Amino acid sequence: MKIVGITGGIGSGKTTVCRYLKELGVNIIDADEIGHRVLQNKGIRTKITDVFGNEVMNPDGNINRKILGELVFGYPERLERLNKITHPLIEQAISSLLEEYRQKGIKSVAIEAPLLVEAGWLKLVNEVWLITAPKESIFKRLHSRMGLSREQAIARIQSQATDNERLKYASVVVNNNCRFEDLKACVQLLAKERLELA
């Protein structure tokens, strides 16, 4: 089974690339989506409130990701503490899904993980595709998609590895500075060359 790690900074276009791969029959594992589910785990919620206080809880008992994000992004030590709580469970969930796909005879899987390098998940993949985009495009996406101010966007960007840091692990670099149809054509070509498609 071929396992590709799709990584890159926030707003670079990882999800779009994965959507195109999914259209080609590649199974997608979204590490952020798993991370959101992990936050619903009662034990994890308790650990998070022990570290960050009850203000990160919604009245319904779930973690308020917006408040938690404001507490950790821009504060590397806090972010590291949060990641130490959540990353082991996220990795465990990804590994379980990969094993399930292996048993089903799935040929190709892409793991969408912005923190693939930082979290130490390179061991889970056969190769890394780095998605990059111009800074201004990223700021616009983060503002329109998440309502982040420029300062909030910068804090999130700075909490992740840089493209240069990720580059040393990348087998493929996809520069997302083009039209959607050009990006799609690029992904289709890469998938045909590097993945086993059904």
Curated annotation (Swiss-Prot):
Catalytic activity annotation: 3'-dephospho-CoA + ATP = ADP + CoA + H(+)
Protein name: Dephospho-CoA kinase
Gene3D superfamilies registered for this protein in UniProt: P-loop containing nucleotide triphosphate hydrolases (3.40.50.300)
Classification via PROSITE patterns: DPCK
Function comment: Catalyzes the phosphorylation of the 3'-hydroxyl group of dephosphocoenzyme A to form coenzyme A.
Pfam families, per the entry: CoaE
EC number(s) per entry: 2.7.1.24
Binding site for ATP: G11, S12, G13, K14, T15, T16
GO biological process assignments: coenzyme A biosynthetic process
Subcellular localization, as worded in the UniProt entry: Cytoplasm
Pathway per the UniProt entry: Cofactor biosynthesis; coenzyme A biosynthesis; CoA from (R)-pantothenate: step 5/5
Domain DPCK: 3-198
GO MF annotations, alphabetized: ATP binding; dephospho-CoA kinase activity
Family to which this protein belongs: Belongs to the CoaE family.
Keywords: ATP-binding, Coenzyme A biosynthesis, Cytoplasm, Kinase, Nucleotide-binding, Transferase
GO cellular component: cytoplasm
Enzyme class: transferase
CDD domains named among the record's database cross-references: DPCK
Family matches, as HAMAP family: Dephospho_CoA_kinase
